[in-house]
Amino acid sequence: MVNSGNVVISSGGGGIPVIEKNSSLEGIAAVIDKDKSCALLAASLNADILLILTAVDFVYIDFNTENQRALTKISAGEALRYRNSGHFAKGSMLPKIDACLDFINKNPKGHAVITSLNMAKDALDGSVGTIIYNKNEVI
């Protein structure tokens, strides 16, 4: 499907973690980080774009305050600075930012986009969403 030029959605929540035990599979208690798993898969495929969908159209700093500001295009270094300054909530935007940074670190020619499901198509052409790129990449 990838070789045919299709957009492949291949990582998400809802799976049941299993281990092999005595030649059979056994369910175990574990958390599957869908942001991290999709970033690892995209990097292993050397994907051009990692698209992460969420409830908002952009990543924001100072989220839910009067100073809230949408980030449209930022370097991985800027994203890391905002991350380390505490701008992204654990269990919400933080794992998405971490996944994007991991993807770019493993695939420096690729870039990541975070946006809402409704804006996914437009985000792929760069007209909406937050684009996170390697500072050496030309977008």
State the predicted function of each range.
Residues 1-139:
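C-terminal catalytic "cap/lid" subdomain
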